[in-house]
Amino acid sequence: MSGKLTGKAREKALAGLKGWSKVKGRDAIEKTFKFKDFNEAFGFMTRVALVAEKMDHHPEWANVYNRLDVVLTTHDADGLSDKDVTLATLMDKWAGKAGKTTKK
């Protein structure tokens, strides 16, 4: 189990995430990814799902055609943890590498 991020460690971790924003009323972060089409969006989700399963850390997400809305939080920690930052960083890397555009 990852512990909840607090204080300076939290500020530092979140400062490194571009395009992610705090979810109103929750200790969570969110981002919308936009892809060329459904196949690219679903392929991205599949790659992320395989890693998320190995991490035992699963995103909350919704997909409509080329759009993917993602919310990350760690339920066991009752808020944001290193697992969320790790998964967000990986998602940004993969989305950027494949030439995807991200948009909030």
From Swiss-Prot:
Gene Ontology molecular function: 4-alpha-hydroxytetrahydrobiopterin dehydratase activity
EC number(s) per entry: 4.2.1.96
Superkingdom of the organism of origin: Bacteria
Disulfide bonds: none
InterPro entries: PCD_sf, Pterin_deHydtase
Pfam families the UniProt entry points to: Pterin_4a (PF01329)
HAMAP family: Pterin_4_alpha
Family affiliation: Belongs to the pterin-4-alpha-carbinolamine dehydratase family.
Species annotation: Parvibaculum lavamentivorans (strain DS-1 / DSM 13023 / NCIMB 13966)
GO BP terms, alphabetized: tetrahydrobiopterin biosynthetic process
Catalytic activity: (4aS,6R)-4a-hydroxy-L-erythro-5,6,7,8-tetrahydrobiopterin = (6R)-L-erythro-6,7-dihydrobiopterin + H2O
Name of the protein in its database record: Putative pterin-4-alpha-carbinolamine dehydratase
Keywords assigned: Lyase
CDD domains on file: PCD_DCoH_subfamily_b
